Amino acid sequence: MKKINLKDKEIEKIINNEQQRQEEHIELIASENYVSKDVLEATGSILTNKYSEGYPGARYYDGCEFVDQIETLAIERLKKLFNVKFANVQPHSGSSANSAAIAALVKPGGKILGMSLDAGGHLTHGYKISFSGTFYDPYFYGVNDEGLLDYDVIEKLAEKIKPELIICGASNYSRTIDFEKFSKIAKKVGAFLLADIAHIAGLIIADLHPSPVGHADVITSTTHKTIRGARGGIIMSNDETLMKKIDRWVFPGYQGGPLVHVIAGKAVAFGEALTPQFKKYQQQIISNAKAFSEEFKKVGTKIISGQTDNHLFTIDVKSSFNISGKEASELMHSINITANKNSIPNDTLGPKISSGVRMGTPAMTTRGFKEVEFKKLARIIIELLANSTSSNLESLKLKLKNEVLELTKAFPTKDYYL
């Protein structure tokens, strides 16, 4: 991609250094991706100059006729993608979306039941350092010994706790989520159901994962992971009464003026997601993840839950390579492979060290990786981690880094990916 040219040379240098890092590194962080040139240009447009508190047709500022058109188009495209009646595209992030949705569904101090962090949940699903664990009364469900959701156990827990809200969805769960079963549990105990599909939204759009529409009362997501759009959040529902409450919590509850330039980037990405190419891309993401994980399994590497049904998986590096997640991710970074340490179920090392490393395929699939490249990448990572205490580690790292650079040169970042 073309390097940026600014009058502010300090910022120019840093941005161009980051661009070079992105070009020369293999990106395995499951929550990251590369946007198209069109998304990038819309997000960096003159729309950043316009303030537009409120919603289309009901703004507190004049001169919003064109930003109204953009936000309306984003909403209509999003509704079409997920076949929903109502949508809000203003949240600045997935966390912002969750905060507004939860506030609309539960009063402060109310009970919420979400997935525990070490089992694959997210901070905003009730973790103590998040708003959801500070202003609400959080409880958690986990996974069984196989790393799978046990819906019978979750049902019994819900019957005991009687939460006002159940949150389903995860930031690190590699298997299919049964939204219908969650819905039955929520209805049985009289709870609202919130589906956080931030990681799997693109797969749902492509009909490669069951949709929560028709099962969840409210659906939240980010727009920059598998949707491959501008960074932000969205909220959807088929319940008009709930959606009106959510809209009020987004604005004026938690946010002021929306980021119109980001909403434009979201709208462009939603348009791209409506194309046949987008479904092929999502299919390749899953095929790559399966091939990638199977290559690790060939040498006995432990995959949490045993396999992947989606775009990510986590390897237990502690039991497989006798190395912590922090050490493993730092080693990988030293040879230009970017991933992230991640807690695993019943992790004894804590989130800052952890026993796992999460692997995601969306970003490198965008750059053109197929199964053969991911298999080669797995072998590079295995060789690195298996020799973490070798006396020849530095020379090995140099060799493997050169192999990584060969891959990144063969699959450069491009101006347009579709």
Curated annotation (Swiss-Prot):
It is found in: Cytoplasm. InterPro entries: PyrdxlP-dep_Trfase (IPR015424), PyrdxlP-dep_Trfase_major (IPR015421), PyrdxlP-dep_Trfase_small (IPR015422), Ser_HO-MeTrfase (IPR001085), Ser_HO-MeTrfase-like (IPR049943), Ser_HO-MeTrfase_PLP_BS (IPR019798), SHMT-like_dom (IPR039429). Belongs to the SHMT family. It is an enzyme of class 2 (transferase). The modification N6-(pyridoxal phosphate)lysine is found at K225. The record marks H224 as: Plays an important role in substrate specificity. GO terms for cellular component: cytosol. It comes from Mycoplasma mobile (strain ATCC 43663 / 163K / NCTC 11711). This is Serine hydroxymethyltransferase. The gene is glyA. The lineage of its organism: Bacteria, Bacillati, Mycoplasmatota, Mycoplasmoidales, Metamycoplasmataceae. The keyword Cytoplasm applies.
